[in-house]
């Protein structure tokens, strides 16, 4: 596996490749990330991964400085997955000049749910993904359903900019107790880690209620948030939405495919999760 930081060297290395499969990450790789690499290999060859902790998607009071950086361990894991190239640019490599041009997602999708609680987050995500796509020029790119809203925004962005890249959705990988794998799980204290699966448990309760015929979505959302709050969580949202556009389902949407999404803080750690219904 070649580890490359230069955009020009990356393009030279990939010249002539027309089936490249790309997996962008921020590093601190776990089994969820590695499952993306395996899925990428099913859809293209060679597989290119990137590691870049993108300052643009972190708010002023978020965890950019303490976000876990484990490059040596990440390289070993990617080598075992037979990744062809790891693109690991520095901030100066990727942003040699101030990034004056930004990609703004549409308000209807970018300013709800995560966008409401993390202003500017999706602008930062779209900008770096667009830049990484320009560098790698992949045939396919793999994103996890764990970040459901991000997946939808990136897919729409690629469609509307006519990028020649198909976005492949990967299923969420969970620990044996149901907790969705995340690099931020390492922030959890021991007692918090034992409590953390309750987020997925509440999502399952909401999903079961909807599948049993409950159509008062606000009632089940509020009940789930109250249950978490009673256990010491600080929920930002638990929301049943249409998979197609992440808007609330109305009476006319009886046959719409749904997803329930959640974000909540447990101690100092903010966790997100979702389940398709």
Swiss-Prot record:
Keywords: ATP-binding, Cytoplasm, Ligase, Nucleotide-binding, Pantothenate biosynthesis
Active site residues of this protein: 33 (proton donor)
A biological process term (GO) from this entry: pantothenate biosynthetic process
UniProt GO MF annotations: ATP binding; pantoate-beta-alanine ligase activity
EC primary class: ligase
Keyword Cytoplasm: yes
Binding site for beta-alanine: 57
SUPFAM superfamilies: Nucleotidylyl transferase
Pathway linked to the protein: Cofactor biosynthesis; (R)-pantothenate biosynthesis; (R)-pantothenate from (R)-pantoate and beta-alanine: step 1/1
Residues that hold (R)-pantoate according to the record: 57, 150
CDD domains: PanC
Gene Ontology CC terms: cytosol
Catalytic reaction(s) noted: (R)-pantoate + beta-alanine + ATP = (R)-pantothenate + AMP + diphosphate + H(+)
Subcellular location field: Cytoplasm
Binding, ATP: 26-33, 144-147, 173, 181-184
Enzyme Commission no: 6.3.2.1
Family: Belongs to the pantothenate synthetase family.
Subunit structure of this chain's protein: Homodimer.
Function: Catalyzes the condensation of pantoate with beta-alanine in an ATP-dependent reaction via a pantoyl-adenylate intermediate.
Comment field (misc): The reaction proceeds by a bi uni uni bi ping pong mechanism.
HAMAP family: PanC (MF_00158)
Protein name, UniProt field: Pantothenate synthetase
Gene name for this UniProt entry: panC
């Amino acid at each position: 596996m070649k580890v490359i930081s230069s955009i020009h060297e990356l393009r030279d290395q990939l010249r002539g490749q027309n089936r490249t499969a790309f997996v962008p990450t921020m590093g601190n790789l776990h089994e969820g990330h590695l499952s993306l690499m395996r899925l990428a290999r099913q859809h293209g060859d060679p597989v290119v991964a990137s590691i870049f902790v993108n300052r643009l998607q972190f708010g002023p009071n978020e965890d950019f400085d303490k976000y876990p950086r484990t490059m040596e361990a990440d390289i070993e894991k990617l080598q075992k997955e037979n990744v062809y190239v790891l693109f690991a640019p520095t901030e100066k490599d990727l942003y040699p000049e101030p990034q004056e041009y930004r990609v703004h997602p549409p308000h209807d999708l970018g300013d709800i749910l995560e966008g409401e609680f993390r202003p500017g987050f999706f602008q930062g995500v779209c900008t770096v993904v667009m830049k990484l796509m320009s560098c790698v020029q992949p045939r396919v790119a793999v994103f996890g359903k764990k970040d459901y809203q991000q997946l939808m925004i990136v897919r729409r962005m690629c469609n509307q900019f006519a990028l020649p890249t198909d976005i492949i959705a990967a299923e969420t990988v969970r620990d044996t107790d149901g907790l969705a794998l995340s690099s931020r799980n390492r922030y959890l204290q021991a007692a918090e880690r034992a409590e953390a699966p309750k987020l997925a448990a509440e999502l399952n309760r909401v999903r079961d209620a909807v599948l049993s015929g409950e159509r008062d979505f606000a009632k089940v959302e509020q009940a789930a948030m109250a249950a978490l709050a009673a256990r010491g969580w600080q929920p930002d949202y638990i929301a049943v939405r249409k998979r197609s556009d992440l808007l609330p389902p109305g009476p006319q949407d009886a046959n719409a495919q749904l997803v329930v999404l959640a974000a909540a803080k447990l101690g100092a750690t903010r966790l997100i999760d979702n389940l398709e219904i």
